[in-house]
Each structure stands twice: as structure tokens, then as C-alpha cells.
UniProtKB/Swiss-Prot annotation:
The species this protein was found in: Xenopus laevis (African clawed frog)
Cytoplasmic topological segments: 43-337
UniProt function note: Lipase that preferentially hydrolysis medium-chain saturated monoacylglycerols including 2-arachidonoylglycerol. Through 2-arachidonoylglycerol degradation may regulate endocannabinoid signaling pathways. Also has a lysophosphatidyl lipase activity with a preference for lysophosphatidylglycerol among other lysophospholipids. Also able to degrade bis(monoacylglycero)phosphate (BMP) and constitutes the major enzyme for BMP catabolism.
GO molecular function, one term: monoacylglycerol lipase activity
The entry's keywords: Endosome, Hydrolase, Lipid metabolism, Lysosome, Membrane, Mitochondrion, Signal-anchor, Transmembrane, Transmembrane helix
Protein name as it appears in the record: Monoacylglycerol lipase abhd6-A
Amino acid sequence: MDLDVLNMFLVAGGTLLVPILAFVTSFLLWPAALIKIYYWYWRRALGMQVKFSSYGNYKFCYTSRGKPGNKASVLMLHGFSAHKDMWLSVVKFLPKNLHLVCVDMPGHEGTTRSALDDYSICGQVKRIHQFVESIGLNKRTFHLVGTSMGGNVAGVYAAQHPTDISSLTLICPAGLMYPTESKFLKHLKGLEKSGDDQRILLIPSTAGEMEDMLRLCSFVRFKIPQQVLQGLVDVRIPHNEFYRQLFMALVNEKSRHSLQENMNKIVAPTQIIWGKQDQVLDVSGAEVLAGSIRGCQVEILENCGHSVVMERPRKSAKLMTDFLSSLQSTENNKKHE
């Protein structure tokens, strides 16, 4: 989610040296535009370049930094209704010698959106594989990272394309049968009983609903100005019809437990990261994965909700870096035996 937009004030007030009066005027009148400027600035500051690739008539939008080298490239898959720039807060703390790729998931941001496309988890896995082939990422094995919906896709991808993957990081992934029901899943059951699909907490259409969504997704309670909330909603509203279509594809029987059905096929070294106070997808899902993926590492973050990437970016980056380093050390030791 877009919790790191709060940093926008520091960026606009100091780093960008925008005159205070102009900033205040823009903030009051065009909050959505400022949010886009915020992401543009951080992409430039972190060296993430926006690029496009094609597979047939299908276009993918992604950002990347660096080039493939001795270390495995890292492909990062975002969650439901987010975009490639949600990873910027983590990229900030990742080593600059890593080759990073952050792609807009099918139908999101700059990647092709079509009402005829298959947005089920298997459909998205197929598209991500097409993206990987379109940029030649699987010429060598790579590290795959996914959060929430992206974690579901990443896990199923690793199960279906094991020769592409060197290692895997799943951050509070969807697609499991959770032993403990979360607040959000209880909310969904209530909607199913009432037949009301217009009040999905992850698809806000007002500033108030946006605030409710952020409270659901984050353990940290930020006091966010109404202008920022309105800006976040204004950016999302034109896409809400698509988000609703996508959401229905994800909760359909075809996708609801996709990761659960494929997790025993995952053979790559796997790391699980989960916020202990996750109200969207309960942390008990980590136990489910640990019981099926041999030797996987589980990291539970205290005082952290579903938006792990935004709430704990430095910690997330460190855990991933340490995991990759440990795998590299193991590989080096094997070579010297």
C-alpha cells in the first residue's frame, strides 16, 4: 500500500527545494499530482529506470537498476492494487550491486489492461513468465520476491517454473488456508452472506474509506492529512472497476487457495516474512508454508501489519540481503569442498 507517501512532506519541503508557498498550494489543490512527483523523484534518486518490454501484443512496464552479474537478479512482484513503485522504500536499503527488477503486475499501472485477460493467479503466473522471457531474465536463475497477491503469484511461479528460480522470498502471501481467520477474511465472509460486493475494504472510493484501508493494512497508526488521503483516493478511483474485477478473480475458487495447492512443489530455498499483527492475511499462514516447504526460513516481525514493505522497509531489505548472502556462502562452500 502507499504508506510511504508520508515521506512526501520531507521530500517536497527539503530535498526538492520547492518553495513553501508553491508546495502548499499544490498540496491543497493537486495532491494526486504531488504523489506522482514523489514517486518520480525517488525513482531518479535511487537509480530505478522505467522501461517497457513486449510479449506479442502485450506490454509490460517495469523499473530496473543495475545489470545481471555474479549475484542472482531480483524480481519483485507487488500486491493487489499497488504498483512497481511500492518497492522503492525497500530498494533504498538494498545493495547497489544487485540487479533489481520491479514489474507492474498484469492490469496495473503501465502494464497492459484488458477485460479479456485472465487475472486468476495461474493467469498472472503465465503473464509474469512471459515478462521474464521478454527481458531474458531466466537466462540465469533469479531470486523472486512477492508480497500479498504478488506473494501468491511468486509462490505458484516457483512451483511451476522451478528451473527459473534460485531462491524465493514470500512476504505475507495470499492463497493459503489460514488456521486463524483474519479481520479482513471475516469481513469478506460477511459480504458473501449479504451479497454486497461494493464495500470491499481494499477498494476505497472516499478519503474516509482510504483511512480505513490504511488502518487495516498497517499496525502503525499514522495521522494522515485529509489532502493526502484524498490524493491517494483520486489516484485509485479511475481504476476501481478493474480492481473489483481483479478481486473477484482472486477470491474465485480457481485462485483462492492457489499457493496452498502448489506449495509442496516449491523446491527453491525459501524465506517467509510476515507481520505478526497482520489483519489482512493472518500470520498463521507462515506455519502452513513452513510445514510444506522443506527448510524454509520464517521471520515474524513484531509490531508490524500487512504492509510489511512500507512499515518495515529497512528490516525487509536486511532480511532479504542476509538470506541471499547466506545462500551465496553455502554455494561457495560447496564449490570448495
